[in-house]
Structures are given as C-alpha cells and as structure tokens.
C-alpha cells in the first residue's frame, strides 16, 4: 500500500499538530472518526469525503459543546449546544449558527421557546421566567421584546409595544383589579395620551 493512499482504520498525525483517528477510504476520511484540531477543539462523529457530515459531537476549547447534525463540515439541522456558562440550546442550526426554531434554557431556569436568527430571539417566541410565573408571549427583534403580552406575577397583563425590553409605544395595561389603561408608553411608564378605565 502506498503511504499517500490511506485506507482502513488508523491514526494520522498532521504537521500542524492536528491528528485524526478513524476510518479512511482512498485517502479521505470516511465513516466514523475523531479529529483533534490545533485550536484545542475535538470532533467525534461521521465523515464523508473528509468533511464532518452526519451525526457528531464537538467539544470546543472554551468548554462549549455541540452534539447533533453536520452537513458539509458545518453544524446544520437539529442539535444541542451547551455553553460553558451553562446555557443550553436545543433546536435548529444553519451554517454553524443558531437559526430557526428552538429552546434556550438559562442557568437560572429562565426559558425561551421560539424563533432564533443569528443566535438571538427574533420572531415569535415565549419567554418564561423561572420565578413568579412571569412570561412574555409575542414578537422579538434582535434579542429584544418588540410587541406582545407580558404576564406579571401579581396578575397584571400588558399587551402592546416594547423597546429595549421596556413598555414603549402603544399598549394596554390590565390591572389585577380589572382597571385598565390604554394609551402611550415611554421607557416603561405611562407617557402621552391615554385612557384609564375603572
């Protein structure tokens, strides 16, 4: 067997310090294999034509981990990403990014379930707080609340516009005692024209 054509199962050490343990077919990584990268990360899973493709797991140098589907050497499809800071995302990925429908659970127990774009909530989603049964159900933009209903732990409900995660714009606030304010808001406070119903 010529040295340049690797086949079967074995270990290959690259000149840059990287190494591969697994199956070879006609000189390419094919099937199950484990790759240790120069940046300190490690991939263990399926290979097709020397690219990560299929099921696999990556452990990154910073402690982050991903387990799920790969396509053409990138995280693609369904998977679970566990951050070093203990945030856990389970859902869809596109070209190595959190993209699509998924669930993000924070270390404090807060949970967001809905649409993600570029790794942050964007689109329709439900954010549930771990304490007090508070939640926001509505539309997100760039990781911030944009429009929807917020349910407060005391029973109050706000339905309307948001800016920088504060009530801002037009909205209706229904108090637990059935009193209601409908009108304009600014930075979390009633501001401008509005109507109070007792």
Task: Please name every model-derived segment.
Residues 1-198:
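Glycine/tyrosine- and acidic-biased, solvent-exposed loop/turn segments at the edges of beta-strands
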């Amino acid at each position: 067997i010529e040295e340049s054509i690797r086949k079967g199962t074995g270990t290959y050490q690259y000149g840059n310090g990287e190494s591969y343990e697994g199956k070879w077919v006609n000189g390419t990584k094919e099937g199950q294999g484990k790759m240790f990268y120069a940046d300190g990360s490690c991939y263990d899973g399926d290979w097709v034509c020397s690219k990560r493709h299929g099921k696999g797991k990556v452990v990154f140098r910073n402690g982050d981990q991903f387990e799920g589907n790969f396509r053409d050497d990138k995280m693609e499809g369904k998977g679970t990403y566990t951050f070093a800071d203990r945030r856990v995302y389970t859902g869809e990925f596109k070209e190595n990014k959190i993209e699509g429908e998924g669930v993000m659970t924070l270390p404090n127990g807060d949970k967001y379930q809905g649409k993600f774009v570029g790794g942050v909530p964007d689109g329709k989603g439900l954010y549930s707080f771990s304490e007090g049964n508070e939640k926001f159900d509505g539309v997100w933009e760039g990781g911030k609340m944009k429009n929807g209903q917020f349910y407060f732990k005391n029973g109050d409900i706000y339905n309307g516009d948001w800016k920088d995660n504060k009530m801002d714009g037009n909205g209706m606030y229904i108090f637990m005692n059935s009193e209601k304010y409908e009108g304009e808001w600014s930075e979390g406070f009633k501001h401008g024209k509005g109507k109070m119903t007792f």
